[in-house]
Amino acid sequence: MLNRPSHIRPVCYRLNDKTLEASLQSSMGLHELEEVDPSLADGHRIFYEREVPFELRSAQGNEEPREVGALEAIRVKILALGDEGAFTGLRVELTSESNLFFHYVHELDIAGFKKLQQGQNLMVDFAEYPSVMVRNLDNCIKQPHSHLAVLVMKRDGSARLDFIQNMEYKFIELLSIDLKASAEEVVRDQIAYRYNAMKNRMALMQARLADVNALVKIKNPSLLLQLKKASLS
């Protein structure tokens, strides 16, 4: 954010049609960018997307890791297939900004959910399962000392995500889901998308900044000079 000198009063201008059109075109560009997301290619739509603190652990063979893992912010994307309230499929994608090749997926349909439901005695149906996931993830964000998300990764590419509640006197496992590392071509497509998305967003922001500079230069050239000096100080 620019530090505006105290003697400069804020100046407001009414946007003309061309400026408004440029703003709309920028918004359309971002919308079109979302449409090429490979995660949405098979009809899924984004249900939830946030960064969540995860404890990452690496397992050797079938032995459970005993040491506490590293804490890292993992971006969680939940994608649903079908109409709201009548989902036919669900996919959870885990990615990391610090490691572009980190990409784990949990996929579940109605039949797979029934096995999960029976194995963990879940008292919800498949339509409510996404909300259960969201509640656990949000609890890990809002109450990190009492709600934990532990991701245990194995060498064969399989992984398990455990949602755990710390009750002071004991740990309670709320939910456990299986994931697996994505195939190389999937990871490659995801990296290409994220790179191009960032590149296009930067281009859109640079174009918008150029439009603002041009408008201020016409309306108030001295203000533009003062803003540039303030940004350099």
Q: How should each PLM-predicted stretch be described?
A:
Residues 1, 28, 123, 133, ...:
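Detector for methionine-enriched segments
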Residues 2-143:
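N-terminal, leucine/charged-rich tether regions that mediate assembly and partner docking
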Residues 44-46, 84, 105, 114-125, ...:
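Short amphipathic alpha-helical molecular recognition features
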Residues 95, 107-111, 150-151, 212, ...:
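Short amphipathic alpha-helical segments embedded in low-complexity Lys/Glu-rich regions
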Residues 103, 165, 219:
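Functionally constrained cores in energy, signaling, and assembly domains
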Residues 128-189:
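Extended assembly-interface/linker segments at domain junctions
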Residues 170-233:
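Intrinsically disordered, low-complexity acidic regions
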